[in-house]
Amino acid sequence: MNSNIFFQPFVGKDYANGGIFGKRIMILGESHYCEEECADCGDCRLHRECMDFTQHVLDDYLNENKERQNWMRTFLKFERSLVGEETNQAMRLKIWNSVVFFNYLQVAMGGPREAGTAEQYQQAGKEFFEVIEKYQPEYVIAWGKRLWNNLPNVRWQDGDDIVVDGYPVATGAYLLSNGNQVKVMAVNHPSVGYSWDYWYRVIQHFLRNS
């Protein structure tokens, strides 16, 4: 386990071979939120029990016996934009077992829609590169324009816009140490105002043509 990464990623069991997508895809969330508001959140030595936070979030979401909560709609809407249809439990498991999910900020926010500081976004870049170097995704889909605007600008190359229904969506790529490229785009954050059928068309273009 990498000690620098506080919120360890969720890694689907079929991710290595691309699962149902046939491509290695990483979903990049922005942050967890936690009501504890520990002053030393993010310190792996003091809060090892929190390092599986992301895993527990996905486990709860994928457990159909867990009571449904409002935050789960974010994952529901996004997963539909990956396959272009309403999803049932069987499809849900296939989708998330095919991807890596990682939250960018390595400290928890106090509540939903809360932003990190400029310093927190900058500091998280090191862990982000550590994760993509380890898991070698071919594609990264980031949640939200705020996160997109705060991603590292090193080892970066701008890509061509994807235009669907007249709206341009920016793309780019990171260069890994082995010479591979990781192609990146961002969707609107699926927690609010998210049209999964529109974003399905954008994502399909991204995965097929970028």
At which residue positions do the language-model features occur?
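A polyanion-binding, active-site-adjacent surface
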Residues: 1-135, 139, 145-147
